[in-house]
Amino acid sequence: MIIKQLSVFLENKTGRLNEVTQLLGNAGINMSAMSLADTSEFGILRMIASEPEKALKILREAEFSVRLTDVICLNSPNEPGALARALNILSGEEVFIEYLYAYSMDNKTANIVLKPDNIQRCIEVLQAHKLELVSASDMYKI
């Protein structure tokens, strides 16, 4: 259930994002989901990669500031209100979501990557409410 996400801190300059994608592509590492957030000084690239430990090593060797973070992925119907229902369940159980990003591959379902404040509690709550979590191995294969 727990997925290793890479968080890469990028200087705000042309080409840095391309360097990351080029390094991982050359190493045969696929990026199945990603989000890029910007601040005035740097960007944060969060991604799920097919081989997170290998990607971490490659990026560190290239002198990127990078770390692994535990996240989970909720498989949800891709329809109005589905995310709100899941978040209502979590907030009702006092589970705080630090951030999330989502993607859809078939327009019927959406995969929502979640970074909760308490990952084990979040998993328990979602499973107790019969919500489907995507396994790490499935995420890494996408």
Where are these regions (language model features)?
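A conserved regulatory-domain signal marking ACT and ACT-like small-molecule sensing domains
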Residues: 1-142
